[in-house]
């Protein structure tokens, strides 16, 4: 069961992210056109823009509630713990090096991608979050608000 969601962003700092199936679909479409693209062409996706740094966590809350669960608490990510353990855990040290991405907004421009493809594959946020939670085993694939019993969270 999803009981809490940790948000790494500083309060009020926007963040951009993409749903991996949308990224895969975009890459496949670009590969289909590779013969017409310049060498080393680069494209950016707009993905989902979270202006407040909380939209993703709030989407997780909505998905859990839609499936009959209690809304998980939204909590700040424990950066202090990452800093404390970073001398001993390489991954944490590397994570600290990326923290700046959560402390200032950064937004990519997808105009070149849209010019090339005519669109950007984009799954609605709530649909993407719910599918991700199901895929990760955080939500039951079959549970719905009408059928959710709580047993799904323990299986």
Regions found by a protein language model. Give the residues of each.
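Residue-level signal for the nucleotide or nucleotide-sugar donor/cofactor binding architecture
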Residues: 15-21, 51, 108, 123
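Short linear loop/turn motifs
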Residues: 102-104, 124-134
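Conserved short-loop catalytic and cofactor-binding motifs
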Residues: 11-14, 44, 48, 101, ...
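Mid/C-terminal beta-alpha module of Rossmann-like enzyme folds, strongest
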Residues: 26-95, 130-133, 139-155
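A conserved pocket-lining segment of Rossmann-fold NAD(P)-dependent short-chain dehydrogenase/reductase
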Residues: 1-18, 22, 26-29, 38
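Conserved C-terminal active-site "lid" loop/helix of NAD(P)H-dependent oxidoreductases
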Residues: 20, 42, 82-120
């Amino acid at each position: 069961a999803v009981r809490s969601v940790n948000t790494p962003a500083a309060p009020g700092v926007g963040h951009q992210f993409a749903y991996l199936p949308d990224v895969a679909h975009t890459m496949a479409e670009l590969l289909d056109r590779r013969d017409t693209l310049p060498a080393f062409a680069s494209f950016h996706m707009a993905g989902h823009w979270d202006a407040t740094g909380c939209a993703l966590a709030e989407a997780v809350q909505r998905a859990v509630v839609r499936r009959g669960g209690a809304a998980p608490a939204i909590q700040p990510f424990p950066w202090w713990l990452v800093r404390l353990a970073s001398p001993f855990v390489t991954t944490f040290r590397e994570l600290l090096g990326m923290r700046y991405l959560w402390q200032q907004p950064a937004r990519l421009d997808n105009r070149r991608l849209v010019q090339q493809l005519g669109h950007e594959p984009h799954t609605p946020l709530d649909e993407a979050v719910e599918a991700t939670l199901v895929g990760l085993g955080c939500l039951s694939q079959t549970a719905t608000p009408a059928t959710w019993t709580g047993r799904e969270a323990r299986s």
